Amino acid sequence: MTGVAAPGAGPRPGSAVARRGGVLPLDKPAGITSFDAIRQVRRILGERRVGHAGTLDPTATGLLPICVGRSTRFVDYFHAQPKTYHCVVRLGERSDTGDTEGVIVAGADASSVRADQVRAELARFKGEIEQIPPMHSAVRHEGRHLYELARAGEEVARKPRRVTIYSAELVDFRPGAPAEAEMVVVSGKGAYMRVLAADLGDALGTGGLLAWLSRTSYGSLGLAASITLDQLEAMDDPWLALLPPEVAVAHLPLVNLGPAQVLQVRRGQSVWLPRSVLPNIAGECRMHDPTGELLGIGELNGGLLRPTKVLAG
């Protein structure tokens, strides 16, 4: 029967199902790039179709969702989901990269900065704000990554981008010269914690850099459900570490389809759904077959469901 259900990720798949693709909630260690992590996952799984959903800098740790197999079609859906970061901002120092990887220089004396001042300035960064992408980033300029230009000693003008900071809370403050502000930040797509650290330091008049960062959640995924590369390597069947592809799209409304409708969708045909079983929604939704397995993504408009991404059966 056709109907609508609440979002959910579903159970962890068995090995046979997992080998068709899924999401690996990797706990990335410090000292490797996100692409280094991808290379290791490809080697361990013996699968070429592997892609991550949002870069973590080499010094950063934490949750790096990796889409495997047919789930790589859903990487972009992760980007729209909020991310939570636990980070430490060092006040009284600056860096050309915005973190500890770059050339660190002294800022202004931060010994007089108080926790209430940090909270007050941090509150100004909540909501929609503008950030200028750092030179050491994957943003492209005339076909080249900014980090490539930075490594060549070039600096180019970058346009500010609008990003969203849903919340930013100071959880600890360690006064001194330099001082350290420990924070938990929930952000939307495209927000740079390095830029937030530098901008916060500028607002306080001391300068600032990102001293430490860990991503603790990404959409419906939490760090508690993640797995390290060493743990993955030690598994008899590492494919069992994969979560269902639905994890990437669990934030979308769910439409359950009957057998005849599934056949239409698999042929790429649109399906009319009875208004009596649909909520007042429009836009993207995820589709389930009668067994509860993810069929793909569709666009719902006035009762007409148009399939846009359909997983192979």
What is each residue range found by the language model?
Residues 1-25, 29-52, 56, 60, ...:
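Accessory RNA 3′-end/elbow-binding domains used by RNA modification enzymes
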Residues 43-47, 65, 155-195, 199-205:
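The conserved catalytic core of RNA pseudouridine synthases
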Residues 45, 49-79, 148:
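Glycine/acidic-rich beta-strand-loop module
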Residues 66, 87, 143, 196, ...:
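Residue-level signal for inorganic ion chemistry
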Residues 76-91, 156-170:
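Structural signature of FAD isoalloxazine-binding scaffolds in flavoprotein oxidoreductases
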Residues 77-131:
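Acidic, low-complexity central loop/insert segments
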Residues 128-133, 177, 194, 206-212:
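Short, structured loop/turn "capping" segments at alpha-beta junctions
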Residues 137, 141-165:
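Extended alpha-helical targeting/anchoring segments
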